[in-house]
Amino acid sequence: MQTQERYDRIEQLIRDRGWEKAAAQIQKEIDNAGMLCLSENCDNARMWESYADGGRGVCLEFLAWDDAGLTFFGLHSFNITYSDSREYNLLRDPWEQAKTIVLTKSPEWSYENEWRIVLRNRLGQCTVGNILFPPEFLTRLIFGKNVDEVTKVAVRKWIRAGRCRPALYQVQSIGPIFSMTQID
């Protein structure tokens, strides 16, 4: 569907049945997209507590871009905007509206320094589940401070069986000063 057709369709929806139909179209765009959330930093105690099961998880570090300046996610990477303001124009393209919604968070979350990879479902493409990436883009794997040996052995086995060769690190301390050491 061409952009102008979308605008025309949204304008007609607003005229016919109000904003509910326009909001439903925006929600449909969100429902048909896949999203991966990433952070710029690995040394935040709050994030280790919340997202890594109190330090019992791992952190994967990906190369942000290669020598040519390309990310393995291409144009699908977006930096989160932290703002209390969320303005929507229901006459805009539904996909652009959907991106505004999923790429804006309250300022209280700004410590996350979050990026999101948003994959739009086009022509029946899968946007959920396992997404392949070039192995060279996984540069580091960091074991949380409280990861058990069984998990470490399993992760090392998976790495040996695959094509990724990230550097392995172990978190030593999370707070008040973050520290980690390379282990392999």
Please report, for each region that a protein language model flagged, where it lies by residue.
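Partner-binding and oligomerization surfaces adjacent to conserved cores of proteins
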Residues: 1-184
